[in-house]
Amino acid sequence: MNDTDKKFPLQPVYDTGFDDGYLQRDYEKCLESAAANDAQTVELQTQLLAEIKNLENEIKALKAQESRQPDPHNNARIQSLEASLNRLVNEYNNFEFQKNYMVDRVAELNNKARFFKDELKRLQQENAAFVNSRYANWADFQSNYQLKLDQFQALIDQQNQTIKQLNEQIAANQGLIDQNVQRLQQNHSLDQQERDALLYEVDHLYNELYELENQKRLVGIEYEATYQDLVSADAELQNVYETIAQNQANFQKQCDAYWAQLKQVEQQIQTTKQELVDEESTLKVRLNDADFYINSRLAELDDLTSKINERDFVSKEQAQDVKASLANLTKEKERLSAEKDSFERLRNTALNDINRMEQENALFAKHLEQQQYEFERKQQESLLKLETEHKQLQKRIGEFKIESEAKSEALLIQERELLEKRREIDDLLTQASLEYEQQRRTNQVLKEKHRQVQQHFQNLVHAKKKLDQKRHYLAEQKRIDEEQIFKLKEKIATERRELEKLYLVKKQKQDQKENDLLIFEKQLRQYQADFENEIEEKQNELFASQKSLQKSFTQLKNKEAELNQKAQKIAEDWAHLKQNKHHHADLEIFLEGEFNHLQQEKHKLLEARTQFDNRVSLLSARFKQKQAELVKQKQSLEQLTAAFNKEQEAVERDWKDRLANLEKQKEMLGDKVHQFDENSLNISKKLAERELAIKFKEKELEAAQKQLSLDNNNNAGLKLQLDKLSESLKTERLELEASKERILDFYDESSRRIADYESDLQARLAEVKTLEKNQQETAAKSERELKVALEKLNQAKKAFLQIRKQQLLEIASVKQQLAQKANLLKNQQAELDKQTEELEAAFLEQDTDKKELEKALHSVKSKQELLERERSFLLQKQREFAEHVAGFKRQVHFKTTQMQRLSEFNKQQQSEQIKRETELKIAFADLKKDYQLFELQKNQEFQQIEQKHKELELLAQKQAELKQELEQKATALASQDQDTVQAKLDLARQQHELELRQNAFNQASLSLNKQREQLTNQVKVLHGELKKRHEKLTLKDRLLAEKEKDQHKKDAEINQRFKQFENEYADFDQAKKRELQELNQIRRNLEQSNASLLKKRNQLTLDFALLRKVQHNTQTNRVQLNTQIKEFLLEKKNFQKASDEAALQKALLIKRLRSFASKLQLQREALAIQKLEFDKRDEQQKSEINNAKLQLEQFKLEKQNFDEAKQKQLIEFKDQCQRLDVEKRLLKQKLVQLKNLSKSYLTYKNRADLSQQQLQHKYANLLELKEKLQTAKRALDKKHRAIYGKMAQFVSELRQEKKQLLSAQKQVDDKSRLLEQNQRHLQNLSSETKKKRQSLEHDINKFDQRRKEAVSSILNSHKKLKQKEGELQGILQKLSLKKTQIEQEFSKLYQQREKLDRQRTTLSKLHRELKAQNEATAHKNREVLEIENYYKKELQRLTTEKSEFDNNKNRLFEYFRKIRNEIEKKEAHIKTVLEETQKKRHLVETEAVKLHLQKQSIISKGQELKEIKERVSRDISHTNKQREELNSLLHQNKLLQKNLAEREREINNKDSLLTQKIQTAKQKLSEKEARILKLLEKMRAVEQQYQAEITRLKTRNADLEKNDNKHLFPPLFKINGNDMNYPYPYPWFYPQQKQEDSSNQIRHLFEQQLQFMQQRYENELTELRRQRALLEKKLDQIQLESQLSAKKNDFEKVEQMMQKLLEKTEQKLSAFDQKINALAEQINTQKAEHADSEKQQLLLRIEQLEKQNLAQAVQTPQPVQPVVQAPAVVPQVIQPQVVQSQPAFLATQQSISKQQQIAQLNAEINSIKKLIAQKAAK
C-alpha cells in the first residue's frame, strides 16, 4: 500500500462537530501527499530521460563501430534501438501531455472547490446577518407590538371610565328629570312660578342629557377606531408571517441552487474518472503493443534458433550475439514493466485524489445539511413563538369583542330605558304636535314621491349602464372579429411612407391642439382670477353693508336708551306728583302731554325698526341672487373643466395611437428579420445540396478516371468529356467558395450590428433607469403633497365640526334663554292678572283709596317698562343669532370653496398619474423591443455556433485527409523491402496516436455540442421566464387599470356625497329661513298685541283721570268703566290664548330643531365611517402601487442578472473556443512533425512501382470517399432530425402557450366580472342604507327604534363588506395559486408526452365549456357535441396511428442500422479476403519460380479461392433477402401513407362543411350588425343635433377629432388577423374608443330621451351576443382543426424525409451491389486470364532460382551464413493488380556479392515454405 492509497478517516469530523480548522489541516495533509506523488512522477520522468540518453549513447557507439567494422548485426541492433528510442520519446511526450492535462484538471477542481468554499462562507455570513437582522427586526416588532397593545389597553380603560362616568351622569340627570316630573304631576298646589322653574330645570336637564349622549357616541366611535387599530396590528403580524415564509422559501431556493452546483461538481469528478479509465485503456493498448513487439522479437529469435538447429550453420559467436540480444530484450521487457508500474501508480494517485475530493464534497454536503437543519430549527422556533403570540392576540381580540358586545348590550339597555322615559315625556307633548304631524304627513307624501322619482331615475341609469356595457362588449367582439378575419394586404414600404407622412401631419395638428389647449388654460386661469376678484369685491360689499347695518342698529339702541331715560324721568315726576297732591292739575296735564309725545316717538322708532327689517330683507335677497350667480359661474367652470379634460383625453388617445403604430412597425420589422433568417437558412441548405452534388460528380469522375486507367482501349472522347466536367466542377467549386466568403462577410457584418444593438440597448436601459428614478421622485412628491392635502382636509374638517358644535351649542343656549324669557313673560302676565283683579275689586267696593290706585298704576308702569326692556333684549339676541347664522354661512361657503380646490387638485394628480402610466407603458414597449433584439442576438449567436461547428467539421475533414495521406504512406512503405519493418511499426504507432488525438478531438466536439444544447435549453427556459414575466406585467397593468377605474368611481361617489351634503345644507338653510320667518311673524304678533295693550293702558289712564275728576259724580261713569274693564279682561284672555299658541309653536320649533340636529349627527357619523373606509382603500391602493413598483424593480434586477449570466456564458464559450484553437495549433504542430518524419521516408518511395502506388491511392480514396459519404450522410440525417424535432417542439410550445394565455385571459375576465358584480352589490348596499335613512326620517315617534335598526344594519353591512373583502382576498390568493400552477405547467411543457396529455385536457376543458355555454341552444349543442366526438375519435385514432408510425419508423431505423453494420462487416470481410488473395497471389508469383515440389499448395489455394467465392455468393444471396424484406417494409409504409391520406381527405371535407356553415352564420351576423349600425348612426345623428344645440365648443372639438381620425386612422389599423402581431397592446389604444367615449358623454346628458330607443334594441343585441358566442365556439373548433392540420403537415414532412432516406439507401445498396458484381467479374476474368500464365511463370522462376543456386554453389563451395530477417506479418493493403515480372531486388543485384544473393534466395525460399505451411494449417 502506498501513502496515496490510504483513506482518510471521517470520524474526527463528527467528533469535533465539523471544525473548520480540522478540515484545513486535513486538506493540507492531502496537499502534502499530492506533492509527494508529484515528486515521484518527476523522478519517473528523470529516469525516462536517463534511459533515453543511454539509448542515444548506445546508438552513437554502434554507429561508430559500424563505421569502423561493418557488421549486419550492428545494423539490426541500431534499427531496433532507434525504434525503441522513438517509442520512448513518444511515450515520454504522451506522459508529459497527460501530466499537464491532469495538473490543469486538478487545478480547475481545486479552484472550483475554493470557489464553493468561499460561497459557503458567504452564505453562512449572509445567513447569520439575515437571522440577526430578522430576529432584531422581530424583537423591535415585538416591542412595538407590546407597546401598541399597552396603548390600546390604556385607551380601552379610559374609554370604559368615560363611558361609566357618562352613564352615571345620564342616570343622575334622568333621576332629576323623573323627580321634577313627579312633582309636577302630583303637587297640584304648586304656583305658576314654581312650575315654570321646574319645567326650566327639566329642559336644562334634557339638554345636558342630550349632550352626554353625544359624548357617549363619540366615545363609541373612538372605541371602534381602537378596534380597527387592533385589527391592523393583527394584519401586520400576518404580514410578518408571510415575509418569514418568503425568506424561508428564498433561502431554500439558494440551498437548492448550491446543491445543484455541487452535483455538477460531482458529475465533473465522475467525468474525470471516466477520462482516467480511458487513459488506462490507452495505457493497456500501449502495453499490449509492447507485448506484441516483445513476442514478435521472441518469435524471431525462435525462428533463428530453429534454423540454426536445422542447418548447423550457426557458430558460437552468433549464439553469443543471440544471447546478448535476448538479454537486451529481457532488459527492455523489464523496463516496459517498470513503466507500466509507474503509469499504474499515476493512475492510483489520480484515483486517490478523486476519492479525496469526493470525501471533501461529502463532508461539505453534510455540513450544508447541518446548517440547513439548524436554520430550519431556528425558523420553526421563531414560527412557534409567532404562532403563540398570534393565538394570544386572537384571545385578546376575542375578549375585547366579548367586552365590547357586553358594553354595547348595556348601552342598548340604557338607551331603552331612556327611550321609555322620553316616551313618557313625549306623551305629554303629543296633544300639542297634532298640527305638526299633519304637516309632516304632507312632507312624507312629497318625500315618497321624490324617492319614487329618484328610484325611477336610478333604474334608468342602471339600465343605461347595462346597455353601455353590452354595447362596449359588442364593439370589442367586433374589433376582435375584424382583427382575426382581415389580414395585411399592402406592401411594407408604401405603408411606412404613408405612416411617416400621416405622422408629420398629425404632429402638426397635435402641436396646434397643444397651443390651443395652452391658450384655453390661460383663459381659464384668467377667468378664475376674475372670478376670485369678483368674489372678494362682493365680500367687501357685504362687509360694508354689515357695518352700515351695525351702525344703524347702534343708533336705534341709543334712541331706545334715550326714550327709556325719558320714561324714567316721567315716572319719577309722576311719583313726585303723587307725593305732592297739592300741586296743581296743570302739571298733570303737562306730564300727560309729554307722555303722549314719548309714545309718538316710540311709534317712530317702531317704524324705523320696520324700515331696518325691510332693508335687511333686501340685502338678504341680493345676497341670495349673488349666491345663485356664483353657483352658475361654478357650473360654467365645471363645464369648461370637463371640456378641457375631454381635450386632454383626446390628446392621450392620439398619443396611444402613435404608440400602436410604432409597435406595428416594430412587428413588421421583426417579420422582415424572420423572413431574412429563413432565406439565409434556405440559401445555406441550397449551398449544402450543391456541395453534395459536386462531391457526387467528383466521385463519378474519379470512378470514370479509374475505368480509364484500367481500360487502356477507351476512347479519347471520354477523356475530353471528363476534362470538361472537371473544369465545370472547378468553376462550381469556385462559386461555392465565393458564396461561402459572402456568407462569412455577412456574418461579420451581423456580429458588428449585434455589438451596435447591444450598445444601443445599454443606452436605452440607462434612459429607462433614469426615467424610472424621475417617476419615483415625482410619485414620492405627489404622495407627499397628497398627504399634506389630506392632513389639511382632515384639520379643516375637524375645525368645521368644532365650529358646528359650538354654533349648535350657542343655538341651544339661545333657545334656553328664549324659553326663560317666555316663562318670565308668563309670570308677569300672571302678576298683571292679579293686579287687574285687585283693581276690579277696588272699583266694585268703591271705598278704596286713591293711594292704592296710584300704587297699582305705578307698579303697572314699572312692569311695562320691564317688559319693554326684555323685548329689546330679545331683539338684540335675535340680531346676534342672525349674525351668527351669517358667519356660519360664510364659513360653510369658504369650506365648500376649499373642497372644490381640493377636488381640482385631485383631478390634476389623476392627470399626472395617467401621464406616469403612459410613460410606464412606453417603458414596457421599450422592454418589448429589447426582448425582440435579444431574440435576434440569440439567433445570431446560434448561427455563430453553427459556423464554429462547421469549422470543426472542416478540421475533422482535414484530419481525415491527413490520415488518408498517412495511410497512403503506409501502403507505400508496405510495398517496400522487408528491411523497413521497424519504420512501418513506427508509422502504425503514429497512426494510433493520431487516432487517439482524433478521439480527443471528437470528445471536445461532443462536449461543445452538449454545451450548445445546454445553452439552447437555458435560452428556452429564459425565454419562457421572460414570457411569464411579461404576462405578469400585463396582468399587473390590467389590475392597475381596474384600480384606476375603481378610484374614478370612488371620486365620483365622493363628489356625489359632497353634492348631497350641499343639497342638505341648502335644505337646512331653507328650513332655518322658514323658522326665522315664523319667529318674525310671532314677534310681529306680539308687537301688535303689545301695541293694543299700550292703547288700552292709555285708555285706562284717561279713564282714571276722568274718575279723579268725576269722583263726586254719579255711578253712571262707573258702569262705563265696568264695561271697559270687562272688555279689557276679554282682550286679556285673547292675549293669553295667543301666548299659549306661541308657546305651542315654540315647542314645535324646539322639536324640529332637535330632530334636525339628530339627523345632522347621524349624517356626520356616516360621513366619518365613510371617511375611514376611503382612507383604508387609499392605503390599500398605495400599498398595491408600491408592490407593483417593487415587482418592476425585481423584474429589472432579474433582467440584469440574466444579461450578466448570458455574458458569462458567452465568455466561457469564447474561452472554450480559444482552448480549441490552442488544441488546433498543437495538432498542426504535430502534423508538421509528422510531415517532417514522412519526408525522411520519401527516399523509399522512389524504389516502389508507380503503378502500384496509383492503384493503392485510388483504392484508398474510394474507401475514404465511401466512409466520408456515410459519415456525412449520418451527420446530415442527425441534423435534419434535430432541426425538425426542434421546430416541431417550438411550434407545439407556441401553440400551447397561446392556448394557455387565452385560458388565463378568460380567467382574468371572469375574475374582473366577479369584482364588478361585487362592486355593484356594494352600490346596492349603499342604496339600501340610503333608503333606510329615508325611512328613519319618515317616523319621528319611532325614531329611536329605527335608529337602532339603522345602526345594526350599518354594522351588518360593515361585516358583510369585511367578509367580501376576505372573499376578495381569498380570490386573489386563488389567483396567485393559479399563477403558480400555470408557471409549473410552463416548466413541464418541454416533454412531448405531457404536451399531448395537456392538449387532450385542454380539448376536454373546451368541450366542457362548450357544453356549459350551449345549454340554451340544445340543437346546436348536439351538432357541436357530434363534431367534438368525431374529433376525439380522430384524435385518438391519429395518436394510435402516430404511435404505430413511430414504432414502424424506429423498427426501420434499427433495421437500417443492422443492415449497415452487416454491410460494413461484409465490406471489411471482402477487403480482408481481397487483401489475402492479393498477398497470396503476390507470394505465389514470387515463390512459384523457386518451388516445383509444392504445386499441391497452389491447388489448395485454388480450393480456398473457391470457398471464398462460395462465401461471397452466400453473402450476396443474404443481402438480396434483406433487400426483399426492406421492400416489403416500404410497401407497408406506403399503405399506411395511403390510409393517412384518405383520412386527411375526410377531415378536409368536414372542415369545408364547417367553414361553409361558419360563413353563412357570419353573413347573417354581418347583416344584423349592419342594421344595428344603421340604428346607431341614427342615434348618433340625434345626439349630434342635441349636442349642437347645447354647446358649440364640443361640436368643434368632435369635428376636429373626427377629421383627425379619418386622416390618421385608415382601415389599415383595423385589418390584422394574427394574434401574435396584435397592433394594439391595450384595448383603450383602439381608435374606436374615442367615438364611444364621446357618445357616452352625450348619453349622460340625454339619458331620459334615449331610454326608449335603447329598450328597442336590447333584444337585437342579446341575439347578436348569442350568435357571436356560437361563432366564437366555431372559431375555437377551427383553431383546433388548424392545429390538427399542422400536425398532419409535420407527419407528412417526416414521412417525406423517411422516403428520401429509403430512396438514398436503395440507391446506395444498388451501387454497392454493382461494385460487388464488378469486383467479382474482375476476379473471375483475372483468374481465367492468368491461370495458365501463373503456372508458366512459377516454373520459369523455380528453374532460374535453381540455376543461380547451382552456379553460385560451384563458385563458392563453403557454407554461407544467411542474414535472416523474419518477415513481420503486417496487415497490408494490396490492390488487385498483377505485379510486373521484374522484381525489385534485381535492380540492385550487381552491387551485392554472390554470397549475399544466395543467402537472400535461401531466405526467400524458406519464407515461402513457412507461408505455405501456415496457410495449409489454416
From Swiss-Prot:
Keyword set, alphabetical order: Coiled coil, Cytadherence, Phosphoprotein, Virulence
Q: Which organism was this protein described from? A: Mycoplasma pneumoniae (strain ATCC 29342 / M129 / Subtype 1)
Q: What does this protein do?
A: Component of the cytoskeleton-like structure which stabilizes the shape of the wall-less Mycoplasma. This cytoskeleton-like network of accessory proteins containing HMW proteins 1 to 5 allows the proper anchoring of cytadhesin proteins in the mycoplasmal membrane at the attachment organelle.
The yes or no answer to whether the keyword Phosphoprotein is present is yes
Q: Give the source's domain of life in one word.
A: Bacteria
What name does the UniProt record give this protein?
A: Cytadherence high molecular weight protein 2
Post-translational events: Phosphorylated mainly on serine residues.
Q: List the residue ranges forming a coiled coil, or say none.
A: 31-880, 919-1607, 1644-1755, 1786-1817
For this protein, the record's InterPro entries field holds: Cytadherence_Hmw2
UniProt GO BP:
adhesion of symbiont to microvasculature
Q: Does the keyword Kinase apply?
A: no
Chain ranges passing through the membrane = none
